[in-house]
C-alpha cells in the first residue's frame, strides 16, 4: 500500500494530503527488514502489515501547512488575535483561518476565487464566513462588500498564488481597521518577471529578493500602510522557493 494511504488507513493522518505533508517533512518512519527507515515519498509502496508511526505531528496542528506559517509569523510580530475580527484573503483550505481561530480570533471572513476548497471543519464553524468565487482584486458590488464595513478588520492576512500581492493590497488597505495589522505572505515567484523564474517555478537568483521587498514596501506605503517588518517566513514553503512575510499597519513608523 502507498505510504500516504497506509497512514490514513491506520488513522495516523486524517487525509492523504495531510499524510503527504508528514512524509515530506520526515515525520514518518516505518520498520523494515533493515530497521527503521523514512518513506522516500508519499507514493512509496510499503508492506500492508508493517509497523509505521508518526514521530512529529506538528504538521497536523492546522488544516494545511499555511497554518504553521501564519502561526509562526504572528508570534514573530507579536500580533494578538484574541477576540479579533479577521479577514483571510486567499482562504483556500483555511490554514491561515485555522491559525487565527486557534489564537483566539472571534471571527474570520474569507475571500477566495476558488470554490469548495475550505476544510469541512472550518466550513461548519459559525465563526467562519467564507466568500467563494470572489477575486479579492475586485470586490465591488459583492456580498462581501455589502456586508462588511470598510476599515472594520483588526487583522488581515493573505496567502495568494499566481497573482502579485500588489494587486490585492488596495482591498486589504480599504478593509483594514485604523489600528489594525496586515500580516501578508509574500511569494517572490509571483512578484518577479518570467525571466527571473527557472525550472520548476523556482526563483533563479537570491539577488532578486531585495527587488521583491522594495516592490512590496513601495506598494504598501503608496496605500498608506507603513511596513513594520519584512522577514523570511519562519516556516519554509513546500516548493523550494523562499517565502517572506510583510507586517504593515496604518500610520505606524517604518522599519
PLM regions and their residue ranges:
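Short alpha-helix
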Residues: 209-223
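Residues at the N-terminus of the alpha-helix immediately C-terminal to the conserved SAM/SAH-binding loop
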Residues: 92-97, 114
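Short, glycine-/aromatic-enriched active-site segment of Class I SAM-dependent methyltransferases
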Residues: 188-205
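S-adenosyl-L-methionine
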Residues: 109-167
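Core SAM-dependent methyltransferase catalytic element
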Residues: 234-255
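S4-like RNA-binding module at protein N-termini
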Residues: 17-72, 76-79
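A short glycine-rich, Lys/Arg-flanked "PGG" loop and its adjoining helix->strand segment in the class I
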Residues: 166-183
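Conserved class I S-adenosyl-L-methionine
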Residues: 81-92, 100, 109
